[in-house]
Amino acid sequence: MVDEYAPGRTFFPSSLIIEGIAQTGGLLLGQLSDFTDRVVLAKVNSCKFHFEAYPGDTLNYHVKITNRDGIGTMVSATSHLGDRLQAEVELMFATLDDERFNDVELFEPAQFCRMIRLLRIFEVGVNPDGTPIKVPQHMVAAEKSLLHIGF
């Protein structure tokens, strides 16, 4: 329970900030394959927190790929409160791509599409050139099938 994490202190736990940054990084990497790769967090390489966040604070996460090879993908990330740098984090992600995971789906495409639409990922996510990311066609088809649109 968060209440027992630091009794008598009200702040946003750093572990939850790392979780939010990791989810942002996972979405970035997933988007590169139109969300067909099975991307998982493998390691928190480093993290530095400059100050605590408190209830009502809005943190903005920025994630950038720094290295991608056959072993995994490294990302560098920051958390900002307004113009202030709140945290710096380096994470490593792995892709579950060997034969043991061939029949494993981390998310059902239609439900995942609905979830990331609710999170407004396609409204705030941008490609390196600044253009908005697009909803992958296989997810649109799965979503239409789920909602019985156009049939």
List the predicted regions and their residue ranges.
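A structural microfeature
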Residues: A87-V89
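Hydrophobic beta-sheet segments that form the core/acyl-binding groove
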Residues: S46-G82
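C-terminal output/interaction extensions
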Residues: M92-S145
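Compact, glycine-rich, soluble single-domain proteins
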Residues: G8-S14, I18-G26
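Catalytic strand-loop segment that frames the active site of acyl-thioester-processing enzymes
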Residues: M1-F12, Q137-F151
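Short alpha-helical scaffold segments that flank and stabilize functional sites
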Residues: Q23-L28, H80-G82
